[in-house]
């Protein structure tokens, strides 16, 4: 498994322990969907200003968000073999993750882990565009986080 990490913010430090949890989440998401670990994921940590700009540029939404996912695989994901294939890019605003961890009353690490898990399922072709799809995605996210004992503390 290749994780390409680009920390483009200077507001919050990211521990090695959190990086290891992120790797575990990525591997578990793929395993849960029946794929092996012959893949690459690009992960960028940014601040609110940068994610706001990216959200406006790529989604046409003029506000800060917590995470953006840029899948590189086609919609026919089931037909794609992951042989050293790049799944795509995940961009997380650590600044927003900290704000949300306070808002939801759990740890910063738990919030970042949730955002990575959420984004991984986007890279794997899932979306939350309907109530049914949202429910399916939430169940998958909770399964992965519970399996790795990443709780709301």
UniProtKB/Swiss-Prot annotation:
Compartment(s): Cytoplasm
GO biological process: rRNA processing
Cofactor note: Binds 1 zinc ion.
Function: Single strand-specific metallo-endoribonuclease involved in late-stage 70S ribosome quality control and in maturation of the 3' terminus of the 16S rRNA.
Top-rank EC class of the record's enzyme: hydrolase
Protein name per UniProt: Endoribonuclease YbeY
EC number: 3.1.-.-
Family: Belongs to the endoribonuclease YbeY family.
């Amino acid at each position: 498994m290749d994780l390409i990490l680009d920390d483009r913010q200077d507001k919050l430090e990211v521990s090695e322990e959190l990086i290891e949890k992120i790797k575990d989440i990525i591997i578990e998401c793929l395993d849960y969907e029946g794929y092996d670990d012959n893949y690459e994921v690009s992960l960028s940590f940014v601040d609110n200003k940068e994610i706001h700009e990216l959200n406006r540029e790529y989604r046409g939404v003029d506000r800060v968000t917590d995470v953006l996912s840029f899948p590189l695989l086609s919609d026919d994901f089931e037909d794609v073999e992951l042989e050293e294939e790049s799944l795509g890019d995940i961009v997380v605003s650590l600044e927003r993750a900290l704000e949300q961890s306070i808002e939801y009353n759990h740890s910063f690490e738990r919030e970042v882990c949730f955002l990575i898990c959420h984004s991984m399922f986007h890279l794997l072709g899932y979306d939350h565009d309907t109530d049914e799809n949202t429910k399916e995605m939430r169940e998958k996210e909770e399964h992965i986080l519970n399996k790795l004992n990443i709780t709301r503390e």
